[in-house]
Amino acid sequence: MAGAAVLRRSARRIYRHLAAAPAFSRSVLQQPKRLLSSQSSPEHGARGAVSGSELALYPPERVRNFSIIAHVDHGKSTLADRLLELTGTIQKGHGQPQYLDKLQVERERGITVKAQTATMFYRHVSASQDSDTPKYLLNLIDTPGHVDFSYEVSRSLAACQGALLVVDAAQGVQAQTIANFYLAFESNLSIIPVINKIDQPTADPDNVKDQLKRLFDIDPSEALLTSAKTGQGLEQVLPAVIERIPSPPGKCDAPVRMLLLDSYYDEYKGVICHVAIVDGALRKGDKIASAATGRAYEVLDVGIMHPELKPTGVLYTGQVGYVISGMRSTKEARIGDTLHQAKSTVEPLPGFKPAKHMVFSGLYPADGSDFEALSHAIEKLTCNDASVSITKETSNALGMGFRCGFLGLLHMDVFHQRLEQEYGAQVISTIPTVPYIFEYGDGSKVQVENPAALASNPGKRVAACWEPTVIATIIIPSEYVGPVIMLCSERRGEQLEYTFIDAQRALLKYQLPLKEIIVDFYNELKGITSGYATFDYEDSEYQQSDLVKMDILLNGQPVDAMATIVHNQKAQRVGKELVEKLKKFIERQMFEITIQAAIGSKVIARETLSAMRKNVLAKCYGGDITRKKKLLEKQKEGKKRMKRVGSVDIPQEAFHELLKVSNSK
Amino acid sequence: MLRLAFPLVSHLPRTKPAAVRPRPPLARRYASSASTSASSFSPPPSPLLPPPLPPASAYVHLPFCRKRCHYCDFPIVALGSSSAPSPGGGEAAEDPRIVDYVQLLLREVSATRPVSDDGVPLETVFFGGGTPSLVPPRLVATILDALRARFGLSACPEVSIEMDPGTFDAARLRELVGVGVNRVSLGVQAFQEDLLRACGRAHGVKEVHEAVGIVTACEGLQNWSMDLISSLPNQTQEMWEESLRCTVDARPTHVSVYDLQIEQGTKFGQMYSPGVFPLPSDTESANFYKIASKRLSEAGYNHYEISSYCKPGYECKHNLTYWQNRPFYAFGLGSASYINGIRYSRPRRTKEYAEWVQKLEDGTWCHESRSSDMKDMALDVVMLSLRTAWGLDLQSFSKSFGKSLALSLCNTFKPFVESGLVIAMDMDRRALPHIDFELDLQNEDDFGSRVAFIRLSDPDGFLLSNELISLAFGIISP
């Protein structure tokens, strides 16, 4: 899912922020409350305690672990809600829609950022054995959908044996459908195509079946037709899960070994890990160890998510649930790690990787004095999002702040939004950048996560520069192919594929420098395709590029927070645009201001902001000086909010605005 | 930072010789056109006097207008065009609204307790509006009588009244002078028919010339001010030059030049945004300001305050009260007083004002507005004194608010002394080269050995006064 539509939603989100500031404080205030109430809230389908002996009734062959994957808005969350209701896990009409998306940012954007699991019990009337209706234990593993989290997705999928591939019956296959399909396919999952929203007047399930056949070689007869909204066709879904998805393959008698899917920090319970038991059984009181860190823990509590924490004291092979083991920070709970019986050597499960940070930006308190508050907020948020890298940095313009590394754009965006929504932090972020590699004539190499840290005049020859790239998939109605090709080539893209997925729609694949898409690529793409384009990307390798550092100078003083790395051929254009933008957003001051973009000591763009002409209040009417004084006080406060470099005051908006330029035409 | 217990009133040169000097002789009226002398602020400073506690000034608000001008956001009462006063203003023509209001105002005057019992009389009275010239002279007299009875009037007080062209004739003005008015502030605003109409003024150019004729011919009235507005919609440089020429030709003793402010809630506020056509651009309107400064200086006027010019000795003493942060009474709708260190603005609506007067009489009103603290006081002093050509007296500022604060202020202004927006002066009010100024700032002990005053330059510093003063605000109240 996400990449595309996620970004589309960010505009909506901004309006919401403007219109509904209270929503903000509400979320901050109510978050802990919800956590509290969720532990034993009766409306969430509390079935009483599920005992360990009950779980023993579900050997691996009675367990199915599956995930739902879809392009954003194709109905994944609604389908999940329906399945939870159908199995009595939650009660219909109780609890909030999009049950598994717990974060405000997930609900607003319709995306999943954190993996969630839910255990359901389902009595299956098998077609073949009409006498026996055994009960099955079904684990729905809700995964993040976006490429930023593709590692997390791959770990979640690794705990599944099958996936429901949900496709909107009217919109058909979109960019993230393709990305998700391949992730599931590469994880060897059984895929059940679900063509959803068939109640729509424009639904064309046959066309979608054709697309599935053409793109994924899926037999049209395998597709289930549903409407999660009206309930039509839903009765086929769980039987298909049981019949078409294999049971988990683990060894029941082996020492316990489990995959860590995701973790949360709970103020009261500490770190809660979601795990899938691959081999053996896990009991309360067991000693377990992490393969990644070697640290050992005692299992303090273990249970299933039904749909909230339900202690069972045990989890058996193939089952999915939670473990609380006295970990103090989610940094100890690395996604994809193998937890195993302590003091035994086990083969770690494959695929574990440390987080890879692809997008970096500086985060600074909007109000310079608030560094401590921001620091506190970041610390708390990283308790729940260990995948962000944080290092302190100082800027001449913005003061003390943090250099943050993110998995990708969406991750960065979500991090910002959570900082604001859940912790009330007001931040200025610098132009996002990617990890470039510069190699010098003397053979030394540096990875550049902050352009300001790169010497403008290094005193030695730059031998080569590399930048990360992505493979982007774009699906568009065919009439937009021309402009999209033009956009991609402006962004230094290289075409890899150009095919038609049906009579109206084209699929384009491009290799693009990551830097070229991190700022405004998607907005532009949406703009030139009347909103029809869907877009997704995956990381690709580094490529050698002709890169230069561009400084922005105000009255000769470089503004470190505005430094950026650009492609040599685009430097002139980007520089010109940046200085023009700055000229617009920096207010006239009592002296002339020159705004320059420079590469090394060579100025490539320049604007002059002439001195302010007048700012005078002519009259103190009838001795009433209070109004005038208020005005001057306001003016003073305005100055206080400015960031200052040398003698030049820079309004915060200038920093926000610069984020919008860096790449566009 | 604020070391001394600060007297509630200003430490600024409170009494200028001009303020106690008798009216300048008639012969002097135009005598000084050549005196565009070194200091634009003609009277030399007098030594600091002990803080004078009781106010010696009173502002009286007379809110009536025929109609509201398009730029105006004052507390006014529009009477409508039918109530143009009959020349001579007999009893029969008196509008009951005016009579009732004056009654109310008189009640306020008598319910106001003088600050001191030892009878410091009023040195200045200012009838502002609205259009005070719409109020029958008989009623103006009753107000002056009430003020005299309550607070006392000095031997030769300055009694100013704002008058609009078209609202008075020679007889009426004579009557006003007869009851004690001795200074007129004539609201001309422009000399172009189109501009007057566009502003929603209730008079035309013909009335302007008539009014000027009446004022200049009036015996016993030597002191009058012409009020102009620059940066009006569609105003061109030629028009502005013409207005200034007409002004100089009319030979007022005082000129007030107001740069149009677009206020929210006014008709102009709905129609225009500052700096956008048909309003002149910032550059043009800055230019208008500079032209006024140039033309009026050439004609012998001192630019003694951001928007005020006068022939030597003809400063508006009442307004000097404001700029020197001295206390003043105020009476009437929406008016603001400054008594015992407390600024208070009266209700802007007639009904609320009437209720307020009632409470004042009953003794049940006590104001919520807190007395200003030292910081506020310092802000006021800086804000007001930097409006004047006299500038900020660093010595007395240091005395009241501490040397280090004065030094910080000077340090903040350092680049602007260098660029010429701010002028540093020695005891003799000679401008200091910025090198000398900077030398003075090297350490606190030396500070003040050379520099004694800072002021904003004319016209460039004045034009950026808000910026410069708000910089100072940032130092005083970070």
Curated annotation (Swiss-Prot), chain A:
Output the Pfam families linked to this UniProt entry. Answer: EFG_C, GTP_EFTU, GTP_EFTU_D2, LepA_C
Q: Which PROSITE patterns match?
A: G_TR_1, G_TR_2
Which cysteines link up through disulfide bonds?
none
The reactions it catalyses are: GTP + H2O = GDP + phosphate + H(+)
Q: Which GO terms describe its molecular function?
A: GTP binding; GTPase activity; mitochondrial ribosome binding
Q: Where is this region: Disordered?
A: 34-53
Q: Name one GO cellular component term.
A: mitochondrion
**Key words, A-Z:** GTP-binding, Hydrolase, Membrane, Mitochondrion, Mitochondrion inner membrane, Nucleotide-binding, Protein biosynthesis, Transit peptide
What top-level class of enzyme does the UniProt entry assign?
A: hydrolase
Q: What is its main location?
A: mitochondrion
Q: Which GO terms describe its biological process?
A: positive regulation of translation; translation
User: What the protein does?
Assistant: Promotes mitochondrial protein synthesis. May act as a fidelity factor of the translation reaction, by catalyzing a one-codon backward translocation of tRNAs on improperly translocated ribosomes. Binds to mitochondrial ribosomes in a GTP-dependent manner.
The cross-references to HAMAP family, in alphabetical order and at most eight, read: LepA (MF_00071)
Q: What is this protein called?
A: Translation factor GUF1 homolog, mitochondrial
Which organism was this protein described from?
Sorghum bicolor (Sorghum)
